[in-house]
């Protein structure tokens, strides 16, 4: 009898409160080194604090997708996820760079522009 009660309680606990809450991604776009026109650099898009883990992240140059590398998907202590997408680039003062994020918590893609002065 005690075994049945324990199994029922375990079943009820598994149904309540364990479902993860969707979380909107936070996006940071930055270069590895201070921007200098004509000098090679690395552009990073760090996306954190999101759940569920399915996400699309693109770096854009003048609105066009760039070839990128990405870190492995990882999670924080609070079970939210984070990911780094990066590529090499050479700023020139004319081209516009941004990061586009698509996630189930967002109605429309989130686009964050790179601010060369940060």
Swiss-Prot record:
Keywords: Disulfide bond, Immunity, Immunoglobulin domain, MHC I, Secreted, Signal. One of its GO terms (molecular function) is peptide antigen binding. Coiled coil: none annotated. SMART domains: IGc1. One of its GO terms (cellular component) is MHC class I protein complex. GO terms for biological process: antigen processing and presentation of exogenous peptide antigen via MHC class II; antigen processing and presentation of peptide antigen via MHC class I; immune response; peptide antigen assembly with MHC class II protein complex; positive regulation of immune response; positive regulation of T cell activation. It is found in: Secreted. InterPro entries: B2Microglobulin, Ig-like_dom, Ig-like_dom_sf, Ig-like_fold, Ig/MHC_CS, Ig_C1-set, MHC/Immunoglobulin. Residues 22-115 form the Ig-like C1-type domain. Disulfide bonds join 45-99. It comes from the Eukaryota. Gene3D superfamilies: Immunoglobulins. Residues 1-20 form the signal peptide. It holds the Pfam family C1-set. Its main location: secreted. Transmembrane segments: none annotated. Belongs to the beta-2-microglobulin family. Heterodimer of an alpha chain and a beta chain. Beta-2-microglobulin is the beta-chain of major histocompatibility complex class I molecules. Component of the class I major histocompatibility complex (MHC). Involved in the presentation of peptide antigens to the immune system. PANTHER family: BETA-2-MICROGLOBULIN, MHC CLASS II-RELATED. This is Beta-2-microglobulin. It comes from Equus caballus (Horse).
